[in-house]
Amino acid sequence: MSGVRTLLEKSGYSEKAIEYYEKMLNVGEIKDPDAHFAYTGPCGDTMEMFLRIESHIITDAKFRAIGCAGSYASASALTEMIKGKTVEEAEKLDEQDILNHLGKIPAPKIHCACLAKRTLQEAIKQYKETRQ
């Protein structure tokens, strides 16, 4: 068991949240994305989200972040959750959906799910504004 994994477990992260953090799913950039937004949360973590949208369905989602394990786990989970969903379905997801999907993260890190959701909301808003 790695030292980081042990620290995350002791801090209160679920096995699923730790796996999302360790695997770093969807970390990266989409060239010429249909939607893109970067946001810095009140904690100082910065997240950037890239979406590929075809026929109003999110076919790919990636992110980059400067942040903690909670931010990476939340964004990894959210980008997995929205793939294959319509833009409207993705918009309806909230922080609690992300937290439920992750299982458990420490209470002081709940804002990380808010950061991921806010970044997604703003990317979708930008997408809609450019499509009008």
Enumerate the predicted regions with their spans.
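Domain-level signature for proteins that mediate thiol-based redox and metal-cofactor handling
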Residues: 1-132
